[in-house]
Amino acid sequence: MVPRLLEYIMNNIKLTTRKTHKEKMLGRMVGISNAMRAAHIDIRKMLFRSVLAEFGGKMRMIACGGAELDSRVFNYLDDLGFNIYQGYGLTETAPILTIRGMFVKSKAGVGRPLRDVRLKIDKPNEMGEGEIVVKAPQVMIGYYHDKKATNEVLRNGWFYTGDLGRIRKDGNLEVVGRKKNVIVASNGKNIYPEELETLINYSDLVRESVVSGMKKGSGIQIVATIVLEDKYKNCSTVDSEIEKLIEEINANLPEYKRINKYVIRQDEFRKTTTMKIKRGSK
């Protein structure tokens, strides 16, 4: 399952509890459950059985991949008893390299490498961020009849993923974005569009968004193109609500990462078969 579907599930649960005036009650139940979990007593399946019953009542786990799942979505659903396993990998790695949830209980990142997977960060910056490179038995031997493309990603037995990430203190890999999507600010620091998009997409107003960098004078202007949820498209106050959202996001960001402008788009972005937005498409 791709992260966007889990976001949809979370938003629908929130909407239902809000409509039925059970939001506060659910919050209290989560508080009780988490206190019990801290004492190694898990009552989630019993406490939230009415929520889980909406998904058949027999769901053991959800495997999530295709992109990193927002930790807030993971935490929300985990609190309600959803067992989510987040994986990371590529088609070229057949397809999994790390996993979080099955043996690793961290609520951030995409987990630790599987057995026999060697993973490192190439040329890390001062934040420890660099390209994720791997060496493992499941890595492809090359692209069919394309030696040039093969040589670009396979070097000295290591596969260069094109993804940027860092290793957290708990040993989990955290993916911060795609190398080709990075926006370089005027101060030379990296801005990862995916990070800003996650913050924007967390709002109930927003269906999806794309953040890009546009030249303005000698600097870069950060622009967010936003697709609203259908029910808000004709809302008279939506512009002021989006402005407020951007202000709240910017308040917690360093100046070079702040969103300078937003554009509301009517049509959804074109997507790949794995529901990833095709950047640059109209």
Task: Indicate where each model-derived feature is located.
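Residue-level signal for well-ordered alpha-helical positions
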Residues: 11-12, 146, 186
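AMP-binding/adenylate-forming catalytic core of the ANL superfamily
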Residues: 136, 141-142, 164-253
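Conserved AMP-binding/adenylate-forming
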Residues: 39, 43-173, 179-182, 197, ...
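Conserved C-terminal "lid"/linker of ANL adenylate-forming enzymes
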Residues: 210-213, 247-282
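Alpha-helical "lid/cap" subdomains adjacent to substrate-binding clefts that gate access
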Residues: 1-61, 228-245, 249-250
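Soluble, non-transmembrane catalytic domains of enzymes that act on hydrophobic metabolites at membranes
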Residues: 1-7, 12-14, 76-79, 101-102, ...
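Generic structural signal for well-ordered beta-strand positions
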Residues: 128, 168, 174, 191, ...
